[in-house]
Amino acid sequence: MAHTSSSTAPSRATTATYAAFISAGFLTATWAGRIPQLKEALQLDSGTWGLVLLAMAAGSVSALPTAGIIIDKLGAKWAVRIFSSLSGLALVGIGFGYLIGPAPVVISLYLMGFGLGVWDVAINVHGARVERAMKRTIMARFHAGYSVGTVAAALTAAVLIAVGFPIWAHLAIVGLGVAALVFYSVRNFLPEEAPSSSTPKVETDTLLDPADAQVVPKKTFFQVWSEPRTLAVGLFVLVFAFAEGTAIDWIGLGLIEGHDAKAAYGTLGLAAFLATMTLTRWFGNGLLDRYGRVAVLRALAFTALVGVLVFVFAPTPELAFVGAAIWGVGASLGFPVGMSAGGDDPANAAMRVSVIASIGYVAFLGGPPLIGMLAEHSSVLQAMLVVAAVTPIGFFLASFLRAPKRDVTSLIEGGADGQSDAK
């Protein structure tokens, strides 16, 4: 009986992790799907709205640098429970706050951003732990679960907008529902790994081949912040997070204001981006196993560039819709593979994932407000060209995500990823 419980624990933990990722995506896209209506209801111009979005960025950025410490203290399970509840209640606050004015929305966005910041790091740390327990790469599929949540939320928002469902009721129902669902589902998370500062761990942070890594003890929070490879991976994630975050917050407005599309069509454009991102994340493991992290991520950086350019310069809303779909493919794997790279060494996974996420979220949440400020002096579509300008940086940084080749750190089923990247 004990054997059965032990063997099924990783499977149950996998399901619980999917639930946490899906819920995070559903909550985030519920907010994003209502952005055009909230902006209109508050009667704000693009520049001022960009400043409102900055509140969410500030919340996440202030949470992420210490998220690893919080998770070490509380454990992933309780970190997810507490901060998903905070995020859900903050969404309720947005739903009622916009009826009063911008100030309650700004406060609620800050709290939602803070909650999402810790929640995101915690589920990625636990996802890396599940990968080690399952002995195969599944992080991209966890992030596909996040995208499933975003697609479902975007489609739900499109339907509710079309039928005139109240914003406050929509956000309140989702906020409370997500908080309750996550609190219950994470009961099946894996037990916390006992820390051991005296046992040497395999160090994979190196600018050379990961096979040349040395055996060193577990690192401190500040030591991890000084690692060249970790910082390079963080910068890589920043580039892809900027592409993803800009799309989520501005594709709808880009279609409506830039391509003169109807409100529901703008939300469907966001759904197209999220749908292709989801499919690529779900099936991307096969590409990573066959061709390796570096080759796949470089190809996706180029794809994202093409998608942005098609979206911006499309002569019709229909072609812009296609550009949004291509953009979703290109932006799909950068963030999840970056999280996997941070968890390559289990000894320092929590701290490294926290650092990488901290760097990435500067763009993921701070980039969209920047687009708003630029749009105030030009247009939404012209401002989006900044994404096209920075995406090539990800192409050159992809080499830092090369997977370790040794068994002690490899999570790739059959070792294909390490073999491919070694070429």
Across the structure, where does each feature detected by a protein language model lie?
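Hydrophobic core of transmembrane alpha-helices in multi-pass small-molecule transporters
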Residues: 22, 90, 102-119, 320-332
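Short amphipathic helix-loop junctions that connect adjacent transmembrane helices
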Residues: 33-47, 249-265
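Helix-to-loop junctions at the C-terminal end of transmembrane segments
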Residues: 63-76, 161, 280-293, 375-376
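Primarily marks hydrophobic transmembrane alpha-helices of the MFS/SLC 12-helix fold
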Residues: 77-81, 297
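C-terminal ends and interior cores of transmembrane alpha-helices
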Residues: 85-99, 303-315
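Helix-loop-helix hairpin linking two adjacent transmembrane segments in secondary transporters
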Residues: 100, 142-193
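Intracellular juxtamembrane helix-capping segments at the cytosolic ends
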Residues: 117-133, 332-347
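C-terminal transmembrane helical hairpin of 12-TM major facilitator-type secondary transporters
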Residues: 291-338
